[in-house]
A protein has these predicted regions:
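Positively charged n-region of N-terminal signal peptides that target proteins for export
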Residues: 1-6
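Bacterial N-terminal signal peptides
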Residues: 9-19
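Sec/Tat signal peptide C-region and signal peptidase I cleavage site
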Residues: 21-25
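Activation targets extended, charge/polar-rich intrinsically disordered C-terminal tails
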Residues: 27-30, 154-371, 376-381, 389-447
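Early extracytoplasmic/domain-onset interaction patches
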Residues: 28, 33, 40-50, 54-63
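Glycine-rich catalytic cores of cysteine/serine-nucleophile enzymes that process amide/ester linkages
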Residues: 52-130
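Second-shell loop/turn segments in exported
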Residues: 64-65, 131-139, 158-167
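Short, charged, amphipathic alpha-helices and their helix-cap/turn boundaries
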Residues: 143-152
C-alpha cells in the first residue's frame, strides 16, 4: 500500500508538471503588449516556483557479488520536498523469467526497461546486498529540472520504457547521463569526445580484477575492438567513471543562486567554472568488498594443461608411440568452446565479432576430428595438423592487436609444440613412408 501511495504521488507530480507547463505556454502566447508580457512573465515564474523544492540527484551504486553487478549501477533520484515524494528512476530493470533469457543475452538481444519506485525500496535493496550508494545533487535551473522531469515522464510511457540493452553503448549509466545532458544544453566543459589512453577491456579489468574467472570469461568473449583507445564520452559507460566526471564537471553558463538548490553560493571547479554537482553525500557508506577466494585460477589450469600436453608429447616421442586418443580429446576440448566464439560472430553485443582467440579454440576441430584421428590411428599423416599449426602461429602474432584471456597464450604455445611434433612424426613414420612409396609406384606404373 505504501508503494502505491508513493507511485500515486509521483504520477500526481508529473500531472502538475504538464498542467503548469501548458498554463505557462498559453499565458505566454497571449503576450501582445508590454504590460501583459510583464504580468504573464510573473505568472509563469510563480507557476514554476514549486520546482525550487525539487532536487534531482545522480545515484552511483557500488559493485555487488553477482556477476551482473560487478560493475556497479546508476540511477536518478527525484525528490519533491514540498509534496513529500521521493522516487528512484532506474534504467536497469530486467527479468530472468523472460523466455529464452540466456540465449537472448548471449546474442545481445536482452531488453531492459525504466522503472520508477520509492527511494526507500531502492535503498533497502542495495543495503541488503551490501553495496554502497553515493548521491550527487545536481545544480539545475527551474527550466532544466522541468525538462528532465518531462523527459523522464515521456521515457516512462509504455511505448518508450523498453530499450535494447548494450553493455558499452546503451546501459543504465548512459541513459541517466543523456537524460541530464540533453536538458542542460551546451553548457558543459566535460563529456566531449576527447581521446583517452584507456580501453574498454582495461576499464572493466579495474572492476573484475579480483574475480579471475569472471575476467577470464569476459576476456574470452571480447574481441580486438575492446582493445582500441576510447574517448572520454565512451569512458563514462561505467557508473563510477560517470560519477567522477560529474564531480569535476564545470558549467560555462552563470546560474543565479536563487535557482540552485537551497540558494547556496555557487561552487567552482578547478577550471574556474560553476560546478554541476551541488552536493555529494553517501547514502550507504562504502565498506570493504568481499573478493574472490577461489584458489584455482585460469592461469593455473592453463599451465597444468600445457604440462600434460608437453609431457604426453615427449613420452610419445621417447616410446615411439602414437597416442591418437589424446589428440582426439584435444580436438574435442578445444572445439567445443570454439562454438561459443563462433556464435559471438552473430551477436549484437559490441566488440565480440572479431576475436582471434577462435584460432586457438577452433570450432573446425569438431568437423575434422573424426577424419584426422582415423588417419592418425592408421599411422598416416593428415594435413589438418599442419593447418592448425599455422593458425596457432597467426593467433600468437595477433596478440599485438588483442589481449587474450588469462592462460590462452600458454595453451596456444603447448598446442603448437605438439602439432609441430606430430606433423614431423607422421612424416617419418614407417606406415606413412610405405604409403608414399605405394603411391609413387602406382603413379609410375600408370605412366
Amino acid at each position: 500500500m505504501k508503494r502505491f501511495k508513493h507511485i500515486f504521488s509521483a504520477i500526481l507530480a508529473v500531472i502538475l508538471i504538464n498542467l503548469t507547463t501548458e498554463v505557462a505556454a498559453q499565458d505566454f502566447s497571449r503576450d501582445k503588449d508590454s504590460d501583459i508580457s510583464v504580468q504573464n512573465s510573473r505568472v509563469n515564474e510563480e507557476a514554476t516556483a514549486w520546482l525550487d523544492s525539487v532536487d534531482i540527484s545522480l545515484l552511483t551504486c557500488g559493485p555487488g557479488q553477482e556477476v551482473w553487478s560487478y560493475y556497479g549501477h546508476t540511477a536518478l533520484r527525484i525528490q519533491n520536498k514540498a509534496m513529500g515524494t521521493d522516487v528512484a528512476v532506474n534504467w536497469g530493470m530486467f527479468s530472468f523469467n523472460k523466455s529464452c533469457f540466456v540465449l537472448r543475452f548471449v546474442f545481445g538481444l536482452t531488453d531492459y526497461q525504466i522503472g520508477i519506485y520509492p527511494m526507500s525500496d531502492f535503498i533497502a535493496e542495495y543495503a541488503h546486498e551490501g553495496r554502497w550508494v553515493r548521491q550527487q545533487r545536481l545544480r539545475l535551473s527551474r527550466t532544466e529540472k522541468l525538462g528532465i522531469l518531462r523527459s523522464i515522464d515521456k521515457n516512462a510511457q509504455p511505448e518508450n520504457r523498453v530499450y535494447r540493452y548494450n553493455f558499452f553503448y546503451d546501459n543504465c549509466t548512459t541513459r541517466a547521463r543523456e537524460m541530464i545532458l540533453s536538458n542542460i544544453g551546451n553548457q558543459s566543459t566535460n563529456f566531449k569526445d576527447i581521446p583517452t589512453t584507456s580501453t574498454y577491456r582495461e576499464e572493466i579489468h579495474k572492476l573484475n580484477g579480483q574475480h579471475r574467472w569472471a575476467r577470464f570469461g569476459n576476456d574470452l568473449l571480447l574481441g580486438c575492438q575492446a582493445d582500441r583507445p576510447i574517448t572520454q564520452r565512451e569512458w563514462e559507460f561505467l557508473p563510477d567513471n560517470l560519477s567522477k566526471d560529474f564531480a569535476t564537471e564545470g558549467r560555462t553558463d552563470f546560474i543565479d543562486a536563487s535557482q540552485t538548490a537551497d540558494g547556496k553560493t555557487n561552487a567552482t571547479s578547478a577550471s574556474g567554472y560553476i560546478t554541476l554537482v551541488d552536493e555529494t553525500s553517501d547514502i550507504i557508506p562504502a565498506r570493504a568488498q568481499i573478493t574472490d577466494d577461489t584458489p584455482v585460477t585460469p592461469q593455473m589450469i592453463a599451465i597444468a594443461l600445457a604440462l600434460i600436453i608437453i609431457g604426453t608429447t615427449v613420452r610419445e616421442c621417447v616410446k615411439k608411440k602414437n597416442y591418437w586418443w589424446f589428440d582426439a580429446i584435444l580436438l574435442v576440448l578445444t572445439g567445443l568452446p570454439g562454438l561459443i566464439l563462433f556464435a559471438m560472430i552473430f551477436s549484437q553485443h559490441p566488440t565480440v565479432q572479431i576475436n582471434f582467440q577462435i584460432l586457438i579454440l577452433n570450432p573446425l576441430n569438431l568437423i575434422f576430428a573424426w577424419k584426422t584421428v582415423k588417419r592418425m590411428k592408421a599411422g598416416r599423416q593428415y594435413w589438418y595438423f599442419e593447418l592448425l599449426g599455422w593458425l596457432l602461429l597467426i593467433a600468437l602474432f595477433m596478440q599485438i592487436w588483442q589481449n587474450y584471456a588469462e592462460g590462452m597464450s600458454i595453451l596456444a604455445l603447448s598446442l603448437l609444440a605438439r602439432y609441430c611434433v606430430k606433423s614431423t612424426m607422421m612424416d617419418l613414420s614407417p606406415n606413412n613412408y610405405g604409403l608414399q612409396k605405394h603411391i609413387v609406384k602406382k603413379f609410375r606404373k600408370n605412366k
